[in-house]
Amino acid sequence: MVQFLKAKNYAEGYTVSVNDNKFFGLVTMSKFPIVDDDHIKFNNDQNNSFLYTDLLIQNDTIRIYNAHIGSARFSQSDYEVMGTEGNFKTWPHQQSEENPQIVTRLANAYKKRATQTKTLLTHSYTSPYPVIICGDFNDTPVSYNYRNLTHKYIDAFTLSGNGTAGSFCSIPMLRIDYLLHSDFFNSYDYQTHDEELSDHRAISTILEY
C-alpha cells in the first residue's frame, strides 16, 4: 500500500493482533513529512482508537485524525434475527458472543460511541493546527454523534457528495464513514468508491486551502 500510494511516510497503531502476523488498527500514509503522531486507545474499549498525525506541507502544519469508533459487533445470526439478509463478514476485532438482547447491545453501543466521539473531539479542540477528521464512526447522519461532529467540522459529503454515498458494503445505503474538516479547508470531488476491499467502501475528497 505504501508503494502503491507513493507515500513514503506513515504512522500506525494497532489494537488487535492475531497469531503475531495479522494486525488490526489504524494507519495514516502521507507523501508529506510527519512531524508528530500518537495513537490513543479509548478507555471504554481498547479495540477502538484514534491516531493523530501532524503533516508539514510547505510551511504549514495540519493535523489529521484517523478514527475507529465502536460498533455493536453484531454476528450473522443477529442480523438474521433483525430480518436483514446478506453476508455480513465479522472481523477479528468485531468478535462477540451471540446475545439475544439486541436492543440492550444497541443502547450500550450508542453510549460507548458517544463517549468515544466526545474524547476524540475534545482532543481535536486542543489542536494548534487546522484539522481533518476521517474514519469509521458506525453512526448515521441522523445520529447524536454526527451532530456533535458537524457542530465545528464540515462533512465533505455535504459540499460535493451525491446520492446516499453508502459506505457499508452489506447495507449499500448506510453511510457511517466520514471525512470532516476545519473551515480552513475547501473540499470538493467527494467520492464513495465501488471496490469492496473490506466490509466498508473507501471514501475520498480533495482538500485545498
Task: Specify the residue positions occupied by each region the protein language model found.
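A solvent-exposed, charged loop/short amphipathic helix patch at secondary-structure junctions
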Residues: Y79-T104
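Surface-exposed cleft-lining segments at the edges of enzyme active sites
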Residues: D38, I102-Y110
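Short hydrophobic/aromatic-rich motifs at helix boundaries and adjacent loops
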Residues: K22, F88-H93, T117-K118, L149
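Metal-dependent phosphoester-hydrolase catalytic domains
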Residues: H39, K111-I132, F137-Y209
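A short alpha-helix capping/helix-coil boundary motif
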Residues: F4-K6, E98-Q101, I171
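A broad, low-specificity signal for short, low-complexity segments enriched in glycine/proline
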Residues: G13-V16, F23-T28, W91-S96, N138-P141, ...
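General secondary-structure edge motif
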Residues: N9, H93, P100, T104, ...
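Structured beta-strand-rich core segments of catalytic domains in phosphoester-bond hydrolases
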Residues: M1-G83, N186, Q191-E195
